[in-house]
Amino acid sequence: MIDPEKHRKLIDFAYAKCLEIPRRKKHCSIILCKNKILAVGINRFKTHPLAVKHGYLFGEVHSELDAYLKCEKRDGLELWNFRFNTHGQMRISRPCPKCLPWCMKVFDKIYHTMD
């Protein structure tokens, strides 16, 4: 079961990160291990060899991959995905069909926001 206090802190942290994103689609991924934040990623317009390998289009790196590339640890990881609209309301932010297969391989648990 998810600790409500931990969940609230992650939502607040992710929302603060999303406010820094200048684009309309504000996705934030947080990687945790033993309740410690190891890496944070956002959707970015840039290229990376792993993005090409996994079929990303338009030179975009999704927040899951952006966070994973920053994370040095490779086991016991939890992925938390968040998305907020321009009014600060949470929206669906589950991994896309291109991200989901590799996310299921590298993360022990995956959580995402819903409408």
What are these regions (language model features)?
Residues 26-40:
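Short beta-strand scaffold segments in enzyme catalytic cores
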